From Swiss-Prot:
Protein name: Septum site-determining protein MinD
Encoding gene (name): minD
Keyword Flavoprotein: no
Principal localisation: membrane
Membrane topology note: Peripheral membrane protein
Top-rank taxon: Bacteria
One Pfam family in the UniProt entry: CbiA
Chain's role: ATPase required for the correct placement of the division site. Cell division inhibitors MinC and MinD act in concert to form an inhibitor capable of blocking formation of the polar Z ring septums. Rapidly oscillates between the poles of the cell to destabilize FtsZ filaments that have formed before they mature into polar Z rings.
Disruption phenotype: In a minCDE operon disruption (minC-minD-minE), cells divide not only at midpoint but also at their poles, yielding small minicells and long rods. Loss of polar localization of several polar-localized proteins including GroEL-GroES, TnaA and YqjD.
Subunit structure: Interacts with MinC and FtsZ.
Keyword Lipid metabolism annotated: no
Effect of G15S: Less effective then wild-type
């Protein structure tokens, strides 16, 4: 049975698309047949981070409107076996996503034996976001350790509890996971950022990952490569840990303590 996981947040710029790409890639690396769908109609970015923007012929909206089949629109990732991308449309209005159309695409993906359907949601509560949230079995709430980001995430939790298909049908609630991104223990200790404990205290949902602030994320994005493929990057390692936890494995949280500087680093400001 496919698990539909929405990667969402209350505000933009927290690393949702980066996280969607990394998590989908990590699941596929674990042998899980995975598709990642870009729900951000008009602002297509997922294909850039996945490095497949030149291979986009048809998109999500083309499939919904009957202009292309799902097989025509799906892009098979060249680097990772078992991984497929369904890009968003750059040209159409956000109302092009209909509930019936999205439901049919998701049902067709399930019939194709996908084990994970990762939905990269736009920020906030616009049509694409509400559509992705509506159909989710699980939600990864992505937030920075900043007050405004955490507060907006709390609003998304309210929507998940009341406006999802599961809520409407009186089914088990959506399983909620917290993903903390751009975490910098040094800034936390200086009081510039909320601590992991602060965020957990406010949102009160289970922590699935802590992704450190890492220049490798920007470098990977610019190269069109999910950062999880960079096995030397701290962020890549943290995303790999996150995937393990999603699959039910226990993993200690890394990169949450301030690194102790040695004498020479302190002396020369390294």
């Amino acid at each position: 049975m496919a698990r539909i996981i929405v990667v969402t947040s209350g505000k933009g710029g927290v690393g949702k698309t980066t996280s969607s790409a990394a998590i989908a890639t990590g699941l596929a690396q674990k042998g899980k047949k995975t598709v990642v769908i870009d729900f951000d109609i008009g602002l297509r970015n997922l294909d850039l981070i996945m490095g497949c923007e030149r291979r986009v012929v048809y998109d999500f909206v083309n499939v919904i409107q009957g202009d292309a089949t799902l097989n025509q629109a799906l892009i098979k990732d060249k680097r990772t076996e078992n991984l497929y991308i369904l890009p968003a449309s750059q040209t159409r209005d956000k109302d092009a996503l209909t509930r019936e159309g999205v439901a049919k695409v998701l049902d067709d993906l399930k019939a194709m034996d996908f084990e994970f359907i990762v939905c990269d949601s736009p920020a906030g509560i616009e049509t694409g976001a509400l559509m992705a949230l509506y159909f989710a079995d699980e939600a990864i709430i992505t937030t920075n350790p900043e007050v405004s980001s955490v507060r907006d995430s709390d609003r998304i939790l309210g929507i998940l509890a009341s406006k999802s298909r599961r809520a409407e049908n009186g089914e088990e609630p959506i399983k909620e996971h917290l993903l903390l991104t751009r975490y910098n223990p040094g800034r936390v200790s200086r009081g510039d950022m909320l601590s992991m404990e602060d965020v957990l205290e406010i949102l009160r949902i289970k922590l699935v990952g802590v992704i450190p602030e890492d220049q490798s994320v920007l470098r990977a994005s610019n190269q069109g490569e999910p950062v999880i493929l960079d096995i030397n990057a701290d962020a890549g390692k943290a995303y790999a840990d996150t995937v393990e936890r999603l699959l039910g494995e226990e993993r200690p949280f890394r990169f949450i303590e301030e690194e102790k500087k040695g004498f020479l680093k302190r002396l020369f400001g390294g």
